[in-house]
Curated annotation (Swiss-Prot):
This is Threonine--tRNA ligase. Its EC number is 6.1.1.3. PANTHER family: THREONINE--TRNA LIGASE, CHLOROPLASTIC_MITOCHONDRIAL 2, THREONINE-TRNA LIGASE. The gene is thrS. Belongs to the class-II aminoacyl-tRNA synthetase family. It comes from Herminiimonas arsenicoxydans.
Amino acid sequence: MITVRLPDGSQREFDTPVTVAQVAANIGAGLAKAALAGKVNGNVVDTSYLIEQDSDLSIITDKDAEGLDVIRHSTAHLLAYAVKELFPDAQVTIGPVIENGFYYDFSYKRPFTPEDLLAIEKKMAELAKKDEPVTRQVLPRDVAVEYFKSIGEAYKAEIIASIPADQDVSLYTEGKFTDLCRGPHVPSTGKLKVFKLMKLAGAYWRGDSKNEMLQRIYGTAWAKKEEQEAYLTMLEEAEKRDHRKLGRALDLFHFQEEAPGLIFWHPKGWTVWQQVEQYMRRVYQDNGYQEVKAPQILDRSLWEKSGHWENYKENMFTTESENRSYALKPMNCPGHVQIFASDLRSYRELPLRYGEFGQCHRNEPSGSLHGMMRVRGFTQDDGHIFCTEDQILDECVAFTALLQKVYRDFGFTNVIYKVATRPEKRVGSDEAWDKAEAALIASLDRSGCTYEISPGEGAFYGPKIEYTLKDAIGRMWQCGTIQVDFSMPARLGAEYVAEDNTKKIPVMLHRAILGSFERFIGMLIENHAGALPLWLAPVQIAVLNISDAQADYAQAVAQNLKKQGFRVHVDLRNEKITYKIREHSIQKLPYIIVIGDKERDAGTVAVRARGNVDLGVMPVDLLVERLNNEVEAKA
């Protein structure tokens, strides 16, 4: 007798081994039809999986996150099937699930075209409509290698040949197409109804630039048509908001080939940067942080002690001088430990909070670089708190409250919280981990935050809280973090004198709110579609005259506003006022002041707010009051 335990606590008993599909049918015809896969004892499996002993089972449908992954994985195989039908000489390589979709890499004698993409998508729909069963078979490694060699799939044969000889491999077949895959997959192609091929790109085989350039086809797949339409609409909106386009259009910054992964900041863009930095400096000052500055380049010996040389060397920029090896810092923490350890510390000094606007460099692969979102040189609002285990809770509560306020001020009110707990390989005692994890969770409970637990996703040196922002068009951005570290202070010799006069090692909390300034400013630009709020806008007000007769008064108004601390541009060009208004509106300025004879004679200004909102005529003092209130409110 086999007992199958279901998520609602009920049980089903069977005399003989039973498949996931059979259990679903036993529960109800509707569930049997909706079943895409199953989760047996925590593992996602095909509906054909045979349950041979007492097990926990949940049936996965398109309402589950795992169901969407199965749909996307199976759609990647459907894409490969369609390509092989249309282009029999193409060779298939790999096709994983990615965020919001999938891709598949192909080797083919000529580049695919946009017209090919349309034909492939049409063929995919035809194959899905056939509702062909998707079946799984397991073969010894060497048999699988020979099979793929026999059908001319050299890349698949190479992948399988790299697997240990004593391991079996699983293959999935739908119609005439067979692919190597761990699975699971949908039971038949008819389950794949909503998909779209998105774009073509190049990708090196195995990610190595010495290998052949393959052709990558990206696609998206969803459970429901409405979900796909919403996603495509979001992509259209994201395209309009792309910080790379807006950076050029608004004269904020640019990129060029001579500096991959680095940014050329223009005066307006650097003004935005300075506003962000000045704001974060006040955050440091108001919350008990001491600002520090550590060297950007450090000797190899320090990186060896910290563990970075062993675990992170390929991502570090290195150099040599006078027979010594150095590296540009990829992160700020070792430098902060040096500052802490430079003096004899007492328990009375703890918690000791350091903050730095630290410039870091990481040798990211060129193919992964993306505007300001993925760069090689960046500045972090990096802070480290040295404390005792008993102080972790209070520090995390204070940090979460601070982070929430900062995000609100920048226009982000939707924050997702995640606690990443201990991995299998870790340093530190179980008791210390218990205490740290409990403190992180309790800090979110005390802060009134809803959160999820991610078991095993902490770093080897400690658990962490991740703070993810949801932007104006629904995209998620992981930004802030607070990370407990049991390892680095000990590795780098940080100690303090405890109350009992013994020397102890402090706990180190790594924390960042914005993360990378570059990435965060890119997010700000996209979240606000370039229309930055008044307090952040590089130019807050443009003063325009209608004719030369008002030029002196316009200059006087502008000078008055500048003295009050506002960033003002005066446009006295001999152009039509409608042209000047339109030009400054395109630059997304918060306010435009128009001055004609009436305004000059009355000592007033005509004010337009962004979005062509006419606020009418008012005295300059009233405008200043309005502007100050708006800056103060960070609206």
